[in-house]
Amino acid sequence: MSHPLPFHSLATLFHHGRAPRHQVAFSLNEHHDWSSFTCHVHSLCEQLKQTEAPRVALCAANSYQFAIGFFALCFSGKAIVLPGNYQPAALNELSCEFDLLLCDEEVGSHLRQAYQLISDTLSAGKPASFPHLLPEQVVLTLFTSGSSGTPKAIRKTLQQLDSEIAVLEQLFGQQLQDCRIESTVSHQHIYGLLFRVLWPLCAGRAFAQTNLEYPEQLVAHASDHTALISSPALLKRLTSEHHSSPFASVFSSGGPLSYEAAMHAQTLFSQTPWEVFGSTETGGIACRQQHQANTPWQLFPGIDVELNQENCLRLRSPHIDGENWYQTADECEMVSERQFLLKGRTDRVIKLEEKRISLVEVEKRLDHLDWINESVVIPMTESDRLTLVAAIVLTSAGTAKLNDLGKGKFWLMLRGELRQWLEPIAIPRRYRVVSEIPLNSQGKRLTNQIEQLFH
Protein backbone atom coordinates (compact mmCIF):
# COMPACT_ATOMS: atom_id res chain seq x y z
CA MET A 1 0.00 0.00 0.00
CA SER A 2 1.37 3.42 -0.94
CA HIS A 3 1.76 6.21 1.60
CA PRO A 4 -1.56 8.10 1.89
CA LEU A 5 -1.69 11.61 0.49
CA PRO A 6 -2.19 14.46 2.96
CA PHE A 7 -5.80 15.47 3.53
CA HIS A 8 -6.61 19.13 2.84
CA SER A 9 -9.77 21.09 3.47
CA LEU A 10 -11.68 22.70 0.60
CA ALA A 11 -10.52 26.08 1.88
CA THR A 12 -6.80 25.18 1.74
CA LEU A 13 -6.67 22.55 -1.02
CA PHE A 14 -5.46 24.85 -3.79
CA HIS A 15 -3.06 26.69 -1.49
CA HIS A 16 -1.29 23.43 -0.54
CA GLY A 17 -1.75 21.77 -3.93
CA ARG A 18 -0.77 18.31 -5.18
CA ALA A 19 2.04 16.93 -7.30
CA PRO A 20 1.60 18.14 -10.92
CA ARG A 21 1.04 14.61 -12.27
CA HIS A 22 -1.35 13.58 -9.51
CA GLN A 23 -4.49 12.14 -11.11
CA VAL A 24 -7.67 14.07 -10.33
CA ALA A 25 -10.29 12.48 -12.61
CA PHE A 26 -10.49 9.67 -15.13
CA SER A 27 -12.66 8.18 -17.83
CA LEU A 28 -12.30 5.22 -20.16
CA ASN A 29 -10.17 7.17 -22.63
CA GLU A 30 -8.47 9.95 -20.67
CA HIS A 31 -7.42 11.28 -17.31
CA HIS A 32 -6.77 14.76 -15.91
CA ASP A 33 -3.92 15.58 -13.55
CA TRP A 34 -3.54 18.28 -10.89
CA SER A 35 -1.56 20.58 -13.17
CA SER A 36 -4.24 20.70 -15.87
CA PHE A 37 -7.00 20.91 -13.26
CA THR A 38 -5.57 24.00 -11.59
CA CYS A 39 -4.89 25.66 -14.95
CA HIS A 40 -8.48 25.01 -16.00
CA VAL A 41 -9.85 26.40 -12.73
CA HIS A 42 -7.70 29.53 -13.02
CA SER A 43 -8.67 30.07 -16.65
CA LEU A 44 -12.41 29.85 -15.94
CA CYS A 45 -12.05 31.92 -12.78
CA GLU A 46 -10.50 34.82 -14.72
CA GLN A 47 -13.36 34.68 -17.22
CA LEU A 48 -15.99 34.67 -14.49
CA LYS A 49 -14.42 37.70 -12.82
CA GLN A 50 -15.27 39.65 -15.97
CA THR A 51 -18.99 38.92 -15.64
CA GLU A 52 -21.34 41.03 -13.54
CA ALA A 53 -23.55 38.07 -12.59
CA PRO A 54 -23.33 37.61 -8.80
CA ARG A 55 -25.27 34.31 -8.71
CA VAL A 56 -24.21 31.52 -11.05
CA ALA A 57 -26.05 28.23 -11.57
CA LEU A 58 -23.67 25.33 -12.21
CA CYS A 59 -24.92 22.30 -14.17
CA ALA A 60 -22.65 19.65 -15.63
CA ALA A 61 -23.05 16.01 -16.58
CA ASN A 62 -19.27 15.55 -16.41
CA SER A 63 -17.93 15.57 -12.84
CA TYR A 64 -14.51 16.89 -13.84
CA GLN A 65 -16.07 19.86 -15.63
CA PHE A 66 -18.32 20.33 -12.61
CA ALA A 67 -15.30 20.44 -10.27
CA ILE A 68 -13.64 23.06 -12.50
CA GLY A 69 -16.79 25.16 -12.41
CA PHE A 70 -17.26 24.76 -8.66
CA PHE A 71 -13.80 26.00 -7.67
CA ALA A 72 -13.70 28.70 -10.34
CA LEU A 73 -16.90 30.08 -8.84
CA CYS A 74 -15.41 29.87 -5.34
CA PHE A 75 -12.30 31.82 -6.32
CA SER A 76 -14.19 34.39 -8.41
CA GLY A 77 -16.40 35.33 -5.47
CA LYS A 78 -19.67 34.18 -7.02
CA ALA A 79 -22.63 32.71 -5.16
CA ILE A 80 -22.96 29.11 -6.35
CA VAL A 81 -26.38 27.74 -7.26
CA LEU A 82 -26.74 23.97 -7.79
CA PRO A 83 -30.07 23.02 -9.42
CA GLY A 84 -31.19 19.50 -8.55
CA ASN A 85 -31.41 18.60 -12.24
CA TYR A 86 -30.81 20.33 -15.55
CA GLN A 87 -34.01 19.64 -17.44
CA PRO A 88 -35.03 22.82 -19.32
CA ALA A 89 -38.37 23.26 -17.52
CA ALA A 90 -36.78 22.67 -14.11
CA LEU A 91 -34.09 25.28 -14.79
CA ASN A 92 -36.69 27.74 -16.02
CA GLU A 93 -38.62 27.27 -12.77
CA LEU A 94 -35.49 28.23 -10.81
CA SER A 95 -34.44 31.11 -13.09
CA CYS A 96 -35.18 33.69 -10.38
CA GLU A 97 -32.44 32.09 -8.26
CA PHE A 98 -29.51 32.80 -10.62
CA ASP A 99 -28.13 35.42 -13.03
CA LEU A 100 -25.92 33.21 -15.21
CA LEU A 101 -26.06 29.55 -16.19
CA LEU A 102 -22.70 27.77 -16.42
CA CYS A 103 -22.76 24.27 -17.90
CA ASP A 104 -20.86 21.68 -19.92
CA GLU A 105 -21.57 20.73 -23.53
CA GLU A 106 -23.76 17.74 -22.71
CA VAL A 107 -26.13 19.86 -20.61
CA GLY A 108 -26.00 22.84 -22.97
CA SER A 109 -27.10 20.77 -25.95
CA HIS A 110 -30.52 20.27 -24.32
CA LEU A 111 -31.17 23.84 -23.19
CA ARG A 112 -33.27 26.55 -24.78
CA GLN A 113 -32.08 29.39 -22.53
CA ALA A 114 -28.83 31.32 -22.63
CA TYR A 115 -25.81 29.72 -21.00
CA GLN A 116 -22.01 29.84 -20.82
CA LEU A 117 -20.02 26.70 -21.58
CA ILE A 118 -17.30 25.72 -19.12
CA SER A 119 -15.13 24.35 -21.93
CA ASP A 120 -15.21 27.60 -23.93
CA THR A 121 -13.09 29.36 -21.33
CA LEU A 122 -10.51 26.69 -20.53
CA SER A 123 -6.88 27.08 -21.48
CA ALA A 124 -3.70 25.38 -20.35
CA GLY A 125 -1.67 28.31 -19.06
CA LYS A 126 1.14 28.50 -16.55
CA PRO A 127 0.57 26.99 -13.11
CA ALA A 128 -1.37 29.49 -11.03
CA SER A 129 -1.17 30.29 -7.34
CA PHE A 130 -4.36 30.37 -5.32
CA PRO A 131 -5.17 32.13 -2.06
CA HIS A 132 -6.83 30.58 0.96
CA LEU A 133 -10.59 30.61 0.55
CA LEU A 134 -12.60 32.13 3.38
CA PRO A 135 -14.93 29.17 3.94
CA GLU A 136 -17.62 31.09 5.81
CA GLN A 137 -17.92 33.56 2.89
CA VAL A 138 -18.34 31.02 0.07
CA VAL A 139 -22.08 30.34 -0.16
CA LEU A 140 -23.85 27.76 -2.27
CA THR A 141 -27.53 27.01 -2.73
CA LEU A 142 -28.84 23.49 -3.21
CA PHE A 143 -32.43 22.42 -3.72
CA THR A 144 -34.58 19.74 -2.16
CA SER A 145 -38.17 18.89 -2.98
CA GLY A 146 -39.02 18.02 0.62
CA SER A 147 -42.52 16.74 1.27
CA SER A 148 -44.24 19.31 -0.95
CA GLY A 149 -42.58 18.43 -4.27
CA THR A 150 -41.72 22.11 -4.81
CA PRO A 151 -37.97 22.93 -4.96
CA LYS A 152 -36.82 24.44 -1.67
CA ALA A 153 -33.60 26.45 -1.53
CA ILE A 154 -31.07 25.35 1.10
CA ARG A 155 -28.06 27.59 1.78
CA LYS A 156 -24.71 26.08 2.73
CA THR A 157 -21.29 27.56 3.33
CA LEU A 158 -17.98 26.02 2.36
CA GLN A 159 -17.23 25.87 6.08
CA GLN A 160 -20.20 23.54 6.64
CA LEU A 161 -19.12 21.31 3.75
CA ASP A 162 -15.56 21.23 5.10
CA SER A 163 -16.88 20.20 8.51
CA GLU A 164 -18.77 17.26 7.03
CA ILE A 165 -15.94 16.14 4.74
CA ALA A 166 -13.55 16.06 7.72
CA VAL A 167 -15.95 13.70 9.53
CA LEU A 168 -16.23 11.44 6.47
CA GLU A 169 -12.46 11.17 6.23
CA GLN A 170 -12.21 10.46 9.96
CA LEU A 171 -14.76 7.64 9.71
CA PHE A 172 -13.96 6.06 6.36
CA GLY A 173 -10.62 7.39 5.13
CA GLN A 174 -8.55 4.44 6.30
CA GLN A 175 -10.58 1.91 4.28
CA LEU A 176 -10.40 4.06 1.14
CA GLN A 177 -6.62 4.35 0.90
CA ASP A 178 -5.38 3.73 -2.66
CA CYS A 179 -8.98 3.79 -3.90
CA ARG A 180 -10.47 5.60 -6.82
CA ILE A 181 -14.12 6.59 -6.91
CA GLU A 182 -16.89 5.33 -9.19
CA SER A 183 -20.42 6.63 -8.77
CA THR A 184 -24.03 6.17 -9.82
CA VAL A 185 -25.34 9.42 -8.27
CA SER A 186 -25.41 13.05 -9.38
CA HIS A 187 -23.05 15.67 -7.99
CA GLN A 188 -25.90 18.21 -8.26
CA HIS A 189 -27.20 16.92 -4.89
CA ILE A 190 -25.47 17.09 -1.51
CA TYR A 191 -24.65 13.36 -1.30
CA GLY A 192 -23.00 13.17 -4.72
CA LEU A 193 -21.43 16.62 -4.32
CA LEU A 194 -19.57 15.48 -1.21
CA PHE A 195 -18.93 11.80 -1.83
CA ARG A 196 -18.08 11.72 -5.53
CA VAL A 197 -16.32 15.10 -6.05
CA LEU A 198 -15.35 17.25 -3.05
CA TRP A 199 -14.30 14.59 -0.54
CA PRO A 200 -12.16 12.74 -3.14
CA LEU A 201 -10.44 16.01 -4.05
CA CYS A 202 -9.68 16.79 -0.40
CA ALA A 203 -8.29 13.28 0.14
CA GLY A 204 -6.42 13.00 -3.17
CA ARG A 205 -8.57 10.20 -4.64
CA ALA A 206 -9.24 10.19 -8.38
CA PHE A 207 -12.92 10.17 -9.35
CA ALA A 208 -14.76 9.04 -12.47
CA GLN A 209 -15.92 11.79 -14.80
CA THR A 210 -19.20 10.07 -15.70
CA ASN A 211 -21.82 7.99 -13.92
CA LEU A 212 -22.37 4.27 -14.02
CA GLU A 213 -26.03 3.83 -14.92
CA TYR A 214 -26.72 0.10 -15.12
CA PRO A 215 -26.12 -2.87 -12.80
CA GLU A 216 -23.94 -4.50 -15.48
CA GLN A 217 -21.62 -1.47 -15.39
CA LEU A 218 -21.20 -1.78 -11.62
CA VAL A 219 -19.98 -5.35 -12.00
CA ALA A 220 -17.70 -4.45 -14.93
CA HIS A 221 -16.05 -1.54 -13.05
CA ALA A 222 -15.67 -3.30 -9.70
CA SER A 223 -12.19 -3.80 -8.28
CA ASP A 224 -10.61 -4.06 -4.86
CA HIS A 225 -9.07 -0.60 -5.44
CA THR A 226 -12.39 1.08 -6.26
CA ALA A 227 -15.04 2.52 -3.95
CA LEU A 228 -18.62 2.76 -5.20
CA ILE A 229 -20.87 5.72 -4.38
CA SER A 230 -24.41 4.56 -5.06
CA SER A 231 -28.03 4.60 -3.93
CA PRO A 232 -30.87 2.14 -3.30
CA ALA A 233 -32.28 3.07 -6.72
CA LEU A 234 -29.51 1.08 -8.41
CA LEU A 235 -28.39 -1.35 -5.71
CA LYS A 236 -31.81 -2.93 -5.44
CA ARG A 237 -31.78 -3.65 -9.19
CA LEU A 238 -28.91 -6.08 -8.77
CA THR A 239 -29.95 -9.69 -9.27
CA SER A 240 -28.43 -13.14 -8.87
CA GLU A 241 -27.78 -13.10 -12.62
CA HIS A 242 -24.99 -10.55 -12.10
CA HIS A 243 -21.57 -12.08 -11.49
CA SER A 244 -19.82 -11.28 -8.23
CA SER A 245 -16.89 -8.87 -8.30
CA PRO A 246 -15.34 -7.08 -5.30
CA PHE A 247 -15.32 -3.37 -4.42
CA ALA A 248 -13.09 -1.93 -1.73
CA SER A 249 -16.12 -0.18 -0.23
CA VAL A 250 -19.74 0.59 -1.14
CA PHE A 251 -21.78 3.58 0.03
CA SER A 252 -25.53 4.11 -0.28
CA SER A 253 -27.71 7.11 0.53
CA GLY A 254 -30.80 8.94 -0.68
CA GLY A 255 -33.42 6.51 0.61
CA PRO A 256 -33.94 3.31 2.60
CA LEU A 257 -31.94 0.26 1.53
CA SER A 258 -33.70 -2.98 2.38
CA TYR A 259 -31.87 -5.64 4.37
CA GLU A 260 -32.29 -8.03 1.42
CA ALA A 261 -30.67 -5.53 -0.98
CA ALA A 262 -27.82 -4.93 1.47
CA MET A 263 -27.16 -8.66 1.77
CA HIS A 264 -27.29 -9.12 -1.98
CA ALA A 265 -24.73 -6.33 -2.45
CA GLN A 266 -22.53 -8.08 0.13
CA THR A 267 -22.75 -11.31 -1.87
CA LEU A 268 -21.91 -9.60 -5.17
CA PHE A 269 -19.29 -7.08 -4.04
CA SER A 270 -17.84 -8.68 -0.88
CA GLN A 271 -18.82 -5.48 0.95
CA THR A 272 -21.88 -4.66 3.03
CA PRO A 273 -22.88 -1.14 1.94
CA TRP A 274 -22.25 1.73 4.29
CA GLU A 275 -25.60 3.49 4.43
CA VAL A 276 -25.55 7.21 5.19
CA PHE A 277 -28.61 8.90 6.70
CA GLY A 278 -29.12 12.63 6.31
CA SER A 279 -30.66 15.31 4.13
CA THR A 280 -29.79 18.42 2.18
CA GLU A 281 -30.83 20.52 5.18
CA THR A 282 -28.97 18.56 7.84
CA GLY A 283 -26.02 17.05 6.01
CA GLY A 284 -24.95 13.62 7.22
CA ILE A 285 -26.45 12.48 10.51
CA ALA A 286 -25.60 8.80 10.95
CA CYS A 287 -24.40 5.64 9.22
CA ARG A 288 -24.75 1.88 9.48
CA GLN A 289 -23.91 -1.45 7.89
CA GLN A 290 -26.82 -3.92 7.96
CA HIS A 291 -25.22 -7.09 9.27
CA GLN A 292 -28.66 -8.04 10.57
CA ALA A 293 -32.22 -6.79 10.08
CA ASN A 294 -33.06 -3.61 12.03
CA THR A 295 -29.43 -2.65 12.53
CA PRO A 296 -29.49 0.70 14.40
CA TRP A 297 -27.97 3.87 13.01
CA GLN A 298 -24.78 5.22 14.61
CA LEU A 299 -24.54 9.00 14.98
CA PHE A 300 -21.69 10.84 13.28
CA PRO A 301 -19.14 12.43 15.64
CA GLY A 302 -20.03 15.96 16.73
CA ILE A 303 -23.80 15.55 16.37
CA ASP A 304 -26.12 15.77 19.39
CA VAL A 305 -29.68 14.45 19.21
CA GLU A 306 -32.84 14.23 21.27
CA LEU A 307 -36.46 13.27 20.60
CA ASN A 308 -39.41 15.65 20.77
CA GLN A 309 -42.86 14.73 22.13
CA GLU A 310 -43.72 12.93 18.87
CA ASN A 311 -40.46 10.94 19.05
CA CYS A 312 -39.05 12.87 16.09
CA LEU A 313 -35.33 13.51 15.91
CA ARG A 314 -33.96 16.92 16.90
CA LEU A 315 -30.30 17.54 16.24
CA ARG A 316 -27.53 20.02 16.75
CA SER A 317 -24.83 19.73 14.13
CA PRO A 318 -21.82 21.64 12.79
CA HIS A 319 -23.13 20.77 9.32
CA ILE A 320 -26.08 23.11 9.97
CA ASP A 321 -25.02 25.95 12.28
CA GLY A 322 -23.62 24.11 15.27
CA GLU A 323 -25.62 26.02 17.89
CA ASN A 324 -29.37 25.81 17.29
CA TRP A 325 -31.44 22.65 17.39
CA TYR A 326 -32.96 21.50 14.09
CA GLN A 327 -36.26 19.63 14.14
CA THR A 328 -36.71 16.79 11.65
CA ALA A 329 -39.86 14.82 10.76
CA ASP A 330 -38.05 11.49 11.24
CA GLU A 331 -39.70 9.35 13.91
CA CYS A 332 -37.04 7.40 15.81
CA GLU A 333 -36.44 5.08 18.72
CA MET A 334 -33.23 5.64 20.67
CA VAL A 335 -31.60 2.30 21.53
CA SER A 336 -28.57 3.91 23.18
CA GLU A 337 -27.16 7.39 23.64
CA ARG A 338 -25.61 7.36 20.14
CA GLN A 339 -27.78 4.81 18.28
CA PHE A 340 -31.34 4.88 16.99
CA LEU A 341 -33.85 3.05 14.81
CA LEU A 342 -35.75 4.90 12.09
CA LYS A 343 -39.53 4.46 12.23
CA GLY A 344 -40.64 6.61 9.29
CA ARG A 345 -41.54 10.15 8.32
CA THR A 346 -44.28 11.92 10.27
CA ASP A 347 -44.72 14.41 7.43
CA ARG A 348 -46.21 11.51 5.45
CA VAL A 349 -49.29 11.67 7.63
CA ILE A 350 -52.42 13.01 5.96
CA LYS A 351 -56.03 13.58 6.99
CA LEU A 352 -58.76 11.61 5.26
CA GLU A 353 -62.29 12.40 6.41
CA GLU A 354 -60.88 13.81 9.68
CA LYS A 355 -58.76 10.72 10.36
CA ARG A 356 -54.97 10.85 10.49
CA ILE A 357 -53.52 8.26 8.11
CA SER A 358 -49.83 7.31 8.01
CA LEU A 359 -48.82 6.57 4.42
CA VAL A 360 -45.71 4.85 5.80
CA GLU A 361 -47.87 2.42 7.77
CA VAL A 362 -50.07 1.63 4.76
CA GLU A 363 -46.96 0.89 2.70
CA LYS A 364 -45.54 -1.25 5.50
CA ARG A 365 -48.72 -3.34 5.65
CA LEU A 366 -48.66 -3.83 1.88
CA ASP A 367 -44.97 -4.72 1.84
CA HIS A 368 -45.47 -7.38 4.52
CA LEU A 369 -47.84 -9.32 2.28
CA ASP A 370 -46.28 -12.32 0.54
CA TRP A 371 -47.47 -11.09 -2.86
CA ILE A 372 -45.88 -7.63 -2.72
CA ASN A 373 -42.18 -6.84 -2.98
CA GLU A 374 -42.45 -3.05 -2.73
CA SER A 375 -45.15 -0.40 -2.71
CA VAL A 376 -45.69 3.34 -2.72
CA VAL A 377 -48.92 4.95 -1.53
CA ILE A 378 -49.89 8.52 -2.42
CA PRO A 379 -53.01 10.64 -1.92
CA MET A 380 -54.96 11.69 -5.02
CA THR A 381 -58.05 13.83 -5.51
CA GLU A 382 -60.69 12.13 -7.65
CA SER A 383 -64.17 13.60 -8.19
CA ASP A 384 -63.42 16.19 -5.48
CA ARG A 385 -62.63 13.44 -2.98
CA LEU A 386 -59.20 12.71 -1.50
CA THR A 387 -58.36 8.99 -1.60
CA LEU A 388 -55.30 6.76 -1.50
CA VAL A 389 -53.81 4.92 -4.48
CA ALA A 390 -50.93 2.44 -4.54
CA ALA A 391 -48.29 1.43 -7.07
CA ILE A 392 -47.01 -2.06 -6.28
CA VAL A 393 -44.18 -4.33 -7.39
CA LEU A 394 -45.26 -7.97 -7.15
CA THR A 395 -43.23 -10.94 -6.01
CA SER A 396 -43.23 -14.06 -8.17
CA ALA A 397 -45.94 -15.44 -5.86
CA GLY A 398 -47.93 -12.25 -6.35
CA THR A 399 -47.65 -12.45 -10.13
CA ALA A 400 -48.85 -16.06 -10.07
CA LYS A 401 -51.76 -15.14 -7.79
CA LEU A 402 -52.78 -12.21 -10.01
CA ASN A 403 -52.74 -14.43 -13.10
CA ASP A 404 -54.75 -17.07 -11.26
CA LEU A 405 -57.44 -14.78 -9.78
CA GLY A 406 -57.57 -11.92 -12.28
CA LYS A 407 -57.33 -8.25 -11.32
CA GLY A 408 -60.75 -7.81 -9.72
CA LYS A 409 -60.47 -10.72 -7.29
CA PHE A 410 -56.79 -9.96 -6.63
CA TRP A 411 -57.56 -6.37 -5.53
CA LEU A 412 -60.41 -7.64 -3.32
CA MET A 413 -57.99 -10.11 -1.74
CA LEU A 414 -55.48 -7.32 -1.01
CA ARG A 415 -58.16 -5.15 0.57
CA GLY A 416 -59.32 -8.07 2.68
CA GLU A 417 -55.80 -8.64 3.99
CA LEU A 418 -55.29 -4.93 4.74
CA ARG A 419 -58.53 -4.77 6.76
CA GLN A 420 -56.80 -6.85 9.44
CA TRP A 421 -54.67 -3.79 10.26
CA LEU A 422 -56.18 -0.71 8.64
CA GLU A 423 -59.44 1.17 8.84
CA PRO A 424 -61.39 1.12 5.56
CA ILE A 425 -60.57 4.79 4.88
CA ALA A 426 -56.83 3.96 4.94
CA ILE A 427 -57.02 1.16 2.38
CA PRO A 428 -55.98 2.27 -1.15
CA ARG A 429 -58.91 2.37 -3.55
CA ARG A 430 -56.87 1.89 -6.74
CA TYR A 431 -53.72 -0.07 -7.58
CA ARG A 432 -51.22 -0.22 -10.41
CA VAL A 433 -48.73 -3.05 -10.91
CA VAL A 434 -45.30 -1.78 -12.01
CA SER A 435 -41.98 -3.49 -12.64
CA GLU A 436 -40.24 -0.98 -10.35
CA ILE A 437 -41.14 2.11 -8.34
CA PRO A 438 -40.13 5.27 -10.30
CA LEU A 439 -37.05 6.76 -8.61
CA ASN A 440 -34.46 9.34 -9.58
CA SER A 441 -30.71 8.61 -9.42
CA GLN A 442 -30.67 9.68 -5.75
CA GLY A 443 -33.22 7.04 -4.80
CA LYS A 444 -36.01 9.59 -4.32
CA ARG A 445 -39.50 8.73 -5.49
CA LEU A 446 -40.71 10.51 -8.63
CA THR A 447 -44.15 11.53 -7.40
CA ASN A 448 -45.23 13.03 -10.72
CA GLN A 449 -44.52 9.78 -12.57
CA ILE A 450 -46.37 7.78 -9.92
CA GLU A 451 -49.39 10.08 -10.26
CA GLN A 452 -49.35 9.63 -14.04
CA LEU A 453 -49.92 5.89 -13.57
CA PHE A 454 -53.45 6.69 -12.40
CA HIS A 455 -54.44 9.17 -15.13
Where are these regions (language model features)?
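Conserved AMP-binding/adenylation subdomain of ANL enzymes
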Residues: 162-180, 188-227
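Conserved AMP-binding/adenylate-forming
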Residues: 45-86, 179, 183-187
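Conserved AMP-binding A3 loop
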Residues: 33-34, 131, 139-166
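Conserved AMP-binding/adenylate-forming core of the ANL superfamily
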Residues: 2-3, 12, 19-50, 156-159
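AMP-binding/adenylate-forming catalytic core of the ANL superfamily
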Residues: 331-425
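Conserved C-terminal "lid"/linker of ANL adenylate-forming enzymes
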Residues: 350, 391, 416-455
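Gly/Ser/Thr-rich phosphate-binding loop
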Residues: 239-293
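Conserved pre-ATP/AMP-binding loop-to-beta segment of ANL
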Residues: 3-8, 18-20, 125-143, 174-181
